[in-house]
From Swiss-Prot:
UniProt protein name: Glucose-6-phosphate isomerase
Residues of the active site: 285, 306, 421
Keyword Membrane: no
Role according to the record: Catalyzes the reversible isomerization of glucose-6-phosphate to fructose-6-phosphate.
InterPro entries: G6P_Isomerase, Phosphoglucose_isomerase_CS, SIS_dom_sf, SIS_PGI_1, SIS_PGI_2
GO molecular function: carbohydrate derivative binding; glucose-6-phosphate isomerase activity; monosaccharide binding
Top EC class of this enzyme: isomerase
Family: Belongs to the GPI family.
Pfam families in UniProt: PGI
Gene name of the record: pgi
Length: 433
């Protein structure tokens, strides 16, 4: 059963979408033949059906070993696509405050910034706990993870000794080349491989994302099942049957014809926050080139309705919204009756908190579309299980690649980020090769 439903009624007419039927078919068939620009990095689209099960079993065994050794915390060190997918998945499935009791590690994230305070506080947090490190970098030269790895490696070596520390350091990197691979060879760390044909922001279903998920207790096999089913749906060339590509075309029309500059992805569940962050990187780096692309923004409602709801309702007409409508929450709560009704909310008795959240969603969509005339794309998802997560990952990755190809862009490069890096390294005095 399909886990995602797309509703474009409050955004765009279906006839406008189908005008792109032939173009989408041509692009998709060229993708399948690896004839599109950037085809060297199309490996992600077949990942769900080409899992390296030997490596997967090794990851499972390493995660079980860490738990058996009473490791309390896994420090995931990476930035951008090297950590966002894992964090998105772990919080999507476990929630922001996961219930205790199952055999899993606490996951914390380092190397995501250059803040001395944040890094010092993380080091202090793990200092008196048993921790392991998963350093994730294809090249091993990205500055933020490199600095964090030095700090955490030194702390781990100080706690257990250099020889023993090697057992608790896991590297996820290139199979053959790069500085981190050289370090792995020298130190003998356990390592898992980032495929050559998968870029960072598309790497969530490689060991980049899968190993931290396993350590966090997720049923990763179910994520892969969902991704496989999703891929079977969304690799089709027929636009009438492929809602991932319908979403891509809707975004394209909003940007190029209706001249919107911003897409806001909205969830009414706070634990979707890092899924939204993953989405922002995916679309921001994929589309933001040649002075093109929608600016990807995200909001958690109803929280952000109390800060930005006014702007969306009556401010500049620069944005449209894509709303994730979760049908079944992890946990629901009933509103109980209070005989004194001192808080004045007895009218909510016999309603559930999720039902009230859905009412807020429906009311907001109506206010934004009927009154403010802000287009709303609705993505209805069945639940927040592992299988549904797998569906979502492939839905958005397929849609994102198609969005870029419709703009005649290479979806898999990001040359613009090299500018600030070059400036920073010049200021810091990095030696030239």
């Amino acid at each position: 059963m399909e886990k995602i439903k797309l509703n474009l009624l409050n955004a765009i007419d279906s006839s406008e979408i189908l005008n792109y039927k032939d173009q989408v078919k041509e692009i998709n068939e060229k993708m399948n033949r690896f004839e599109m620009i950037g085809s060297d990095f199309l490996g992600w689209k077949d990942l769900p059906n080409q899992i390296n099960w030997d490596e997967f079993l090794n990851m499972e065994e390493k995660a079980k070993w860490l738990i058996k050794e009473n490791v309390e915390i896994l420090v995931v060190i990476g930035i951008g696509g090297s950590y966002l997918g894992a964090r998105a998945a772990i919080e999507f499935v476990n929630g922001t405050f996961p219930l205790s009791g199952s055999k899993k590690l606490e996951i914390i994230y380092a190397g995501t910034n250059l803040s001395s305070t944040a890094t010092a506080q993380l080091l202090a947090y793990v200092e008196n706990k048993k921790f392991a490190i998963n350093i994730i970098s294809k090249s091993g030269t990205t500055l933020e993870p490199s600095i964090a790895f030095r700090f955490f490696r030194e702390l781990l070596e100080k706690k257990v000794g250099k020889a023993e520390s090697r057992k608790f350091i896991i590297a996820t990197t290139d199979a053959n080349k790069g500085l981190l691979r050289e370090i792995v060879r020298k130190e003998g760390y356990t390592s898992f491989i980032i495929p050559d044909d998968v870029g960072g922001r598309y790497s969530v279903l490689t060991p980049v994302g899968l190993f931290p998920m396993l350590c966090a207790g997720l049923n990763v096999r179910e994520i892969l099942v969902g991704a496989q089913k999703s891929n079977d749906f969304y690799k089709k060339s027929d636009l009438e049957e492929n809602i991932a590509y319908q979403y891509a075309v809707a975004r394209h029309i909003m940007h190029t014809q209706k001249k919107y500059a911003v897409e806001v992805l909205i969830s009414y569940e706070p634990y979707f926050q890092y899924f939204l962050e993953w989405w922002k990187q995916l679309f921001g780096e994929t589309e933001g080139k040649n002075e093109l692309g929608l600016y990807p923004s995200s909001k958690i409602f109803s929280t952000d309705l109390h800060s930005l709801g006014q702007f969306i309702q009556e401010g500049s007409r620069i944005l449209f919204e894509t709303v994730i409508n979760l049908k079944k929450p992890k946990i629901d709560l009933d509103i109980s009756e209070d005989k004194e009704n001192f808080d004045g909310i007895n009218y909510l008795v016999n309603k559930t908190l999720h039902g009230i959240n859905v009412a807020a969603l429906d009311a907001t969509v109506s206010a934004h579309t009927d009154v403010a005339k802000v287009p709303n794309i609705i993505l209805e998802i069945a639940d927040s299980t592992e299988e549904t997560l797998g569906w979502l990952f492939m839905f958005f990755e397929r849609a994102c690649a198609m969005s870029a190809y419709l703009l005649n862009l290479n979806p898999f490069n990001q040359p613009g980020v090299e500018v600030y890096k070059a400036n920073m390294f010049k200021i810091l005095g990095k030696p030239k090769k």
